[in-house]
C-alpha cells in the first residue's frame, strides 16, 4: 500500500474515509484564509482571516461575516457566507507523497445536493512537491446565506497516480490520425 506522510497543523483534523468502500477522504475546515497573502510569521501557511475562535478586529469585511451560533456545549463562532460568495478555507494538513502520486480536491455530493454548497476549484490538483496547506474555494450558490463551521467536512481528497507521457511535437495537423468524431466538440454526442 502506498504511504502518504501527513503533518496535521494546529487545529487540523485527519482526513477520513467515512465508509470501507469510500475512495475519497473527507477533509474539514480549519480556518478561513487569504487567497493572496501568506502568514507573516509562518511562510508555509496562508494568512488566517478567521480562526473560528475569536472575532477578528482588524478586518471589517471578515468581521461582518462572523456570527455567534448558540449550542448546548456553548456558543460557537461561524462564518456566514453571502449568496454567491466564494471563501477560501484551509483544510489543516500538509502532505508528502512519492512522485507521481497526487490528490484531487473534489466537492462532497451531499453538500452540493442538499445545501447548494460546492467548490469552484474542482478538481483542485495538489502535486507531490507542494508543501503547504491545501485550500478549498467554497462557493455558496444559494439565494440565502450559509454558515461555515470549524471542523465542517467541506470537501474530499482523492489520491491517484499520474501518467506522465512523453510529448512528441508533430510538424503538421495531417500527421495526427483521423477519427470519426473529428473536431466535433461541446455537446456533439447529445444528451440522450
Across the structure, where does each feature detected by a protein language model lie?
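DUTPase catalytic domain/fold
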Residues: 1-192
